[in-house]
Amino acid sequence: MSQAALNTRNSDEETPSSRRNNGTRLAGILFLLTVLCTVFVSGWVVLGWMEDAQRLPLSKLVLTGERHYTRNDDIRQAILALGAPGTFMTQDVNIIQSQIERLPWIKQASVRKQWPDELKIHLVEYVPIARWNDQHMVDAEGNTFSVPSDRIGKQVLPMLYGPEGSASEVLQGYREMGQVLAKDKFTLKEAAMTARRSWQLTLNNGIKLNLGRGDTMKRLARFVELYPVLQQQAQTDGKRISYVDLRYDSGAAVGWAPLPPEESNQQQNQAQAEQQ
């Protein structure tokens, strides 16, 4: 058989196989394109569905944490101030957290989303241990904050006063001097520090102490030592101690005031009973 005839026969045998390979390759390409188109269209539809606020709105608000000053409406209004709430997928919880922490009595807020439509917020409020310059409060760490006056209630707190930015210093002084006074059953009602670092105290019995600058603890100890003598003199004279000025190297200047009528009558009755 000639070489030409052999080549012709081989060519005829390969043609059907080549056609099948081409068809398979084309089918594979079409299938891949179909899959890609399906994924793209599906992703587009799902993304649109997730971004549709009518399908996945953050419509539920859950608040946790110990609250004394925060009302539900405070949080709701803080969130609405940012505009209409986003969807579960699009809402940035960090923005909400920052907005809530702008409330002056909020120490910390933790915000997270709960599928499918819930916003969970955990609140930590500042805990006041004293009032600061009448208008604010101070916590145990020396942080100052404010609370709406109608939410404070009847909570009785010591009063602290000082220059702006000195809350931590005044609080530390209040604690140290309060510990000294507590040993003799005194309680600090008020502590004030001037811009020159001069201290004035008011005790729970109404006595005012002027400690001046420097040696405050030494001067406070002097008052504790003098108090029994001053108290005895007050009872003898039928007066009360109004103030004690301790800005001296030794001794003190004492201011006296009349007893309130009820205390004066009580002392007179007690004296008469002792005479009988």
From Swiss-Prot:
Q: Where is this region: Disordered?
A: 1-20, 257-276
One example of a Gene Ontology biological process annotation: FtsZ-dependent cytokinesis
Residue ranges that the UniProt entry lists as topological domain Periplasmic: 50-276
Question: What GO cellular-component annotations does this UniProt entry give?
Answer: cell division site; FtsQBL complex; plasma membrane
Localization (cell) = Cell inner membrane
Q: What is its main location?
A: membrane
Q: What is this protein called?
A: Cell division protein FtsQ
Q: Which organism is it from?
A: Salmonella typhimurium (strain LT2 / SGSC1412 / ATCC 700720)
